[in-house]
Swiss-Prot record:
Keywords: Ribonucleoprotein, Ribosomal protein. The keyword Ribosomal protein applies. NCBIfam families: rplS_bact. One of its GO terms (molecular function) is structural constituent of ribosome. This is Large ribosomal subunit protein bL19.
């Protein structure tokens, strides 16, 4: 492994540690939550459509999502390791036999539909994804509880220190009189 591949692997691991993306492939309907900056405000916008391609590898990997918006086909390319991509949710798994679904650009209506994959692999992926989401929520909740307990302990220590200081001040006043 040369130095560039090593650096890319380190960066990909660092980004993957912050957020986990589910396993998805072309044909799957995905909801991509993207951070949008408007002036000095930031908000998260959901972009839902069919993943029609995954390309590249390593840190340069990207995927293309196509949706029909007000009768017009809109495609958007998202880098997998972009900091602007908050999360990706798989809405449904599609059953396709191609890696690139560019033929959907020429199709309209029912002919552009993709059959839902209900096989065992898709079921396992969905179950694993749900389990990962539950574990992530439990971990976040545990962190919140730990932070709340630490804050309560900190407040109690501060109040005890204040009470002790007030007690010492009263003792000093009594000694001065």
């Amino acid at each position: 492994m040369n130095i560039i591949q090593q650096l890319e692997a380190e960066q990909a691991a660092k980004i993957a540690a912050k957020r986990t993306l589910p396993e998805f492939s072309p044909g799957d309907t995905v909801r991509v939550n993207v951070r949008v900056v408007e002036g000095n405000r930031t908000r998260v916008q959901a972009y839902e459509g069919v993943c029609i391609a995954r390309s590249g590898g390593g840190i340069n990997e990207s995927f293309t999502v196509r949706k029909i918006s007000y009768g017009e086909g809109v495609e958007r390319v998202f880098p997998v390791y972009s900091p602007l991509v908050e999360s990706v949710d798989v809405v449904r798994r599609g059953k396709v036999r191609r890696a690139k679904l560019y033929y959907l650009r020429d199709r309209r209506g029912k002919s552009a539909r993709i059959v839902e994959n209900t096989g065992t692999r898709a079921r396992k992926l969905n179950d694993a994804e749900r389990q990962a989401v539950v574990e992530e929520k439990a971990r976040i909740e545990a962190e919140k509880v730990a932070a709340a307990q630490a804050l309560a302990a900190e407040k109690a220590a501060a109040e005890a220190a204040e009470a002790k200081a007030a007690e010492e001040a009263k003792a000093a006043e009594a000694a001065a009189e």
